[in-house]
């Protein structure tokens, strides 16, 4: 799988992810790009789960963003509705972390849209490790969002065999 982490702090929001693609217990690729900018670079999105499934969801989510003029929550809810009702989409195995200047959301394969507590998202096989690390850093340091995301991904990469140290990091200014 992978690890994706999103941190919002001090006027910045970051989504970061590692680059490992695994097939069973074999590393197939180490430099995949699982974090992207969408909708005229105004929305960040990262995925954990099946790569082909995630690209399908990225495309559909970007279409929803265009339909709803970049409104993050409305686009996420509409994608989740499709995910629940479309027979082909229901079989997709992926989870998305998305953020814009105003908010962050998790969109699950069950069609759920969740606004995280404390503006922290950590998903994927190393998500629990990254979340624990990021929580500790948020509560006990003055580090910025980017540094917290990097450090928590490094810790997840040290522990989780499905997470590596080849990171993609995207950042936006927040309101």
Swiss-Prot record:
One of its GO terms (cellular component) is HslUV protease complex. Its main location: cytoplasm. Allosterically activated by HslU binding. The keyword Heme does not apply. Its EC number is 3.4.25.2. Keywords: Allosteric enzyme, Cytoplasm, Hydrolase, Metal-binding, Protease, Sodium, Threonine protease. GO terms for biological process: proteolysis involved in protein catabolic process. The active site is at residue 2. Na(+) binds at residues 157, 160, 163. Pfam families: Proteasome (PF00227). It catalyses: ATP-dependent cleavage of peptide bonds with broad specificity. It is found in: Cytoplasm. GO terms for molecular function: metal ion binding; threonine-type endopeptidase activity. Protease subunit of a proteasome-like degradation complex believed to be a general protein degrading machinery. A double ring-shaped homohexamer of HslV is capped on each side by a ring-shaped HslU homohexamer. The assembly of the HslU/HslV complex is dependent on binding of ATP. This is ATP-dependent protease subunit HslV. It comes from Photobacterium profundum (strain SS9).
């Amino acid at each position: 799988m992978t690890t994706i982490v999103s941190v919002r702090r001090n006027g910045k929001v970051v989504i970061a992810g590692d680059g490992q693609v695994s097939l069973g217990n074999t590393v197939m690729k180490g430099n995949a790009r699982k974090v992207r900018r969408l909708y005229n670079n105004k929305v960040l999105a990262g995925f954990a789960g099946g790569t082909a499934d995630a690209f399908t969801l990225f495309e559909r989510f970007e279409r929803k963003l265009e339909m709803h003029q970049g409104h993050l929550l409305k686009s996420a809810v509409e994608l989740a509705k499709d995910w629940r009702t479309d027979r082909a989409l229901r079989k997709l195995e992926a989870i998305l972390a998305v953020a814009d200047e105003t908010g962050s959301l998790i969109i699950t394969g069950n069609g759920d849209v969740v606004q995280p507590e404390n503006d922290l998202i950590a998903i994927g096989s190393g998500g629990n490790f990254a979340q624990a690390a990021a929580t500790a850093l948020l509560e006990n340091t003055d580090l910025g969002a980017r540094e917290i995301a990097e450090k928590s991904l490094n810790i997840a990469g040290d522990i989780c065999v499905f997470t590596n140290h080849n990171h993609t990091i995207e950042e936006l200014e927040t309101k």
